[in-house]
Amino acid sequence: MRESTLMEKVTRRTISSFIFFIVSSTILFLAGKSSAKISHNGDNNVTALFLFGDSFLDAGNNNYINTTTLDQANFPPYGQTFFGLPTGRFSDGRLISDFIAEYANLPLIPPFLEPGNSQKKLYGVNFASAGAGALVETFQGSVINLRTQLDHYKKVERLWRTNFGKEESKKRISRAVYLISIGSNDYSSIFLTNQSLPISMSQHVDIVIGNLTTFIHEIYKIGGRKFGFLNVPDLGCFPALRILQPKNDDSCLRDASRLASMHNRALTNLLFQMQRQVKGFKFSLFDMNKSLRLRMQHPSKFGFKEGEEACCGTGKWRGVFSCGGKRIVKEYQLCENPKDYIFWDSLHLTQNTYNQFANLIWNGGHMSDSLVVGPYNINNLFQIP
């Protein structure tokens, strides 16, 4: 099938140039100042937000690294719905992290690599990188892996000690919320790059979870206590992976979906184990997998008109990762109204979808499908001293 052939060609690594950096950074700064209701200037009780992981949270770090357009979204039509220009976010507008910052009365959290005044980093920092995984080997050399994101966080922690002093910095680190989305690329990359696993699926999941466990313990040692997690969505049902289905039918890519399920079971077990064994460790886990499947199965129930096809892309389900025409495949189609779609491109979601997810993550027990969040919601975590 031609779509599958194109997708295999598209899967990784082309040279790109940076687009709209200065303009986009200015818009982001102004948007952050205007949209958030800042009420804690000089407030010692401010709760900061730190973000780690992949494209579900990356607000533009990949704009500033030597990578390819497969891992960048700094060209139109990305960003068209909210910012009016591309910002590096893999969506038509805002991400979950942007909405959470707004609900917490914080400015838009700046990417770690964004040039500018370090004072902007005193309410939190976004370390996430599109394409990143818990494994160093995942798209190695083209993304900022979780281990490097941790190194960047340690630099900010030193900056905080300089700005606030040792004791005040320690209090702020402890009060901060750490939101993490990681794992999707560790599994989807196997299929997108046509690899074969040298180990069993369960062993692969164990290594991913092991690296994530080490990361959490490192943040905890520095002083972090309040963590939020997005689990891995049903990857096999994403348009980019569905077109790789060898049966040439409309089903999801079974092994990709299976890896996501295995990861999520292991992640849930890990977090509840840590809650029992690690003093002061508190967490919120968002079942992104279930939430996305509900919307794909019943799009109209959640205000969508299209539950499977992407808004932007090429081929069946617009599953070829061609949105914007800056990747290997230059031709692409763009829907009229992204708000009607769950998927923005073949691997990412629309602002409308992220907005719904952010509401669930923040409000927890007040939504119709609230069982997807627990044992705390993110609002609860922000309220804990």
Curated annotation (Swiss-Prot):
It is found in: Secreted. Keywords: Glycoprotein, Hydrolase, Lipid degradation, Lipid metabolism, Secreted, Signal. Transmembrane segments: none annotated. GO terms for cellular component: extracellular region. CDD domains: SGNH_plant_lipase_like. It is an enzyme of class 3 (hydrolase). The active site is at 55 (nucleophile), 345, 348. Residues 1-35 form the signal peptide. GO terms for biological process: lipid catabolic process. PANTHER family: GDSL ESTERASE_LIPASE 5, GDSL-LIKE LIPASE/ACYLHYDROLASE. This is GDSL esterase/lipase 5. It comes from Arabidopsis thaliana. The gene is GLIP5.
